[in-house]
């Protein structure tokens, strides 16, 4: 059947009715097809979300895998002994501890120190632990060590170049449980009443729970020192000697004033560096004391006994000493 209407006619699928069927049947058909359409829309949304999430994963920076650049090195017994010795001398100055040990880096030393500190705190053996560094704006800043080239001034006419923080003026923990004084103070004459002196004072034994103390001229507060384990007594050979051989030191100083002794320079070359430094320190202090005005009365008293004229030929060193001339060291 051909329609006579010249205008086009667009069929509405929702409102179109089938001949012989009412509009209610058409509505039922449209309602039955709506669940299929909604499920399709949900599936499309899920696919879109998956695609967007995959794009985000690709856009994220890939994390670089962790690689160990250097394998862990175990600490040997000599290295650990040097580490303990450096803790006594430098506290938490890791750069100086690194230079003292020589075979470990600062990172390795700090890691080893952290483990050692935790072990000591748990065991409760009373080992020496250096105090932690305070914050920058702390009321009591961390005490700084005196530089090696800094000379300490003693009140009065005497000058002292001793350095309390130098390793040569400190006892090893197993060598003695006493306080020691520097060779400069030990060589000071009794007429130096205005100079500060440090006397030898015995301390309680380590078994009573007390720790050894180390005295410092810059601070009056004693710092706790601890005793080593028994194993350190067998490892003295590989550890550095920090105590001068005073018998050899004073023997050399006595030979300087002996007119029959010679080859002093050769003897100095054969001595350990710590003994050489102690000899030079004592000789410098002796020359300062002899040239001070306080010694003038003693020099006149000795001159009254005419020691200079009696020993002018046999004991030239004594005569030169009384006349403020430094003794000559023969080579």
Swiss-Prot record:
Provide ranges: composition bias, Low complexity.
Answer: 211-220
* Entries under Pfam families matching the protein: Myb_DNA-binding (PF00249), RVE6 (PF24904)
Query: Does the record's keyword annotation contain Transcription?
Result: yes
Domain HTH myb-type: where? Answer: 67-121
Source organism per entry reads Arabidopsis thaliana
Q: What does this protein do?
A: Probable transcription factor. RVE4, RVE6 and RVE8 are components of the circadian system acting synergistically to regulate flowering time, redundantly to regulate leaf growth, and antagonistically to regulate hypocotyl elongation; their action seems independent of ZTL and HY5.
What protein am I looking at?
A: Protein REVEILLE 6
The record's region (Disordered) falls at 122-166, 203-237, 309-331
- Keyword set, alphabetical order: DNA-binding, Nucleus, Transcription, Transcription regulation
Listed GO CC annotations: nucleus
Q: What residue ranges does this record give for the DNA-binding region?
A: 94-117
Q: Which SUPFAM superfamilies match?
A: Homeodomain-like (SSF46689)
SMART domains assigned to the protein according to its UniProt record, in alphabetical order: SANT (SM00717)
Q: Where in the cell is it found?
A: Nucleus
| InterPro entries per the UniProt record, alphabetical | Homeodomain-like_sf, Myb_dom, Myb_dom_plants, SANT/Myb, SANT_dom
Q: Which GO terms describe its biological process?
A: circadian regulation of gene expression; circadian rhythm; entrainment of circadian clock by photoperiod; regulation of circadian rhythm; regulation of leaf development; regulation of photomorphogenesis; regulation of photoperiodism, flowering; response to blue light
Highest taxon, organism lineage? Eukaryota
> What are the boundaries of the signal sequence?
none
Q: Report if keyword Nucleus is assigned.
A: yes
